[in-house]
Amino acid sequence: MMTIREYKRAESLEEAWQLNQKKANRVLGGMIWLKMENINVGTAIDLSGLGLDTIEETEGSFSIGAMVTLRQLEEHAGLAAYTHGAVKEALRHIVGVQLRNLATVGGSIYSRFGFSDVLTLFMAMDCSVELYKGGIISLQEYAERPYDRDILVRLIVKKEEAEFFYQSVRNSQTDIPVLTCAAARLADGCYRIAIGARPLKAVLYEFPAENGVPAQELALKCADAVKNDIITGSNMRGSAEYRCHLAGVLTKRAVVELEARTAQEGN
């Protein structure tokens, strides 16, 4: 059970940051996982008054505020068009609409949970995070960092000419995933493939363009590279060996799908 001594609705990012420097204080986010912890919170810091609940699309990027809910993300027409439905596919299995109306992008990215569909999804994009004091860094670098007490302000997704594809394996429709896979094929033929729910946090693999190589051959090559390198673990949802096998299977499917799309668009 979580006990909160004081509640403060921050009036500025500076105030939120100052409050968050005390170890006993916590940023609330969407209060999905935090409320399940057995902790005593000195001051609960609410960011809902700072205008961080919007998605702004420009010609070259998306700016996604930390307080944007997963449901907002799921329903955003611009993101749906840009990712060819990958965002919706990544989010639709997360428990239910009620939870997705509460859970925030910032909470999902800051937590860097191993099972996070959100982290896996954005890892395959040209995505950065903006921290109040730490500035803008790549999501990949942020995912590898230890937890700190900075304030995550927004995600920045740079638009690029690419095709995206998302898959997950689950034991039931809305369960935590056994393994997740997000893939991007860039216009020059290079690939970015993120594998999550290992059950460790998502990792990114990048493959150079190999134009002229048959799709099946390229898919097998990428799948073997991922299988031979990935570190997986076991839990109640699956063994390390099973996850390693799935990583290869999902990588192969992703490459075959994206190569087929590219070939179709070229005809």
List where the protein language model places each region:
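C-terminal structural segment of proteins
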Residues: M1-N267
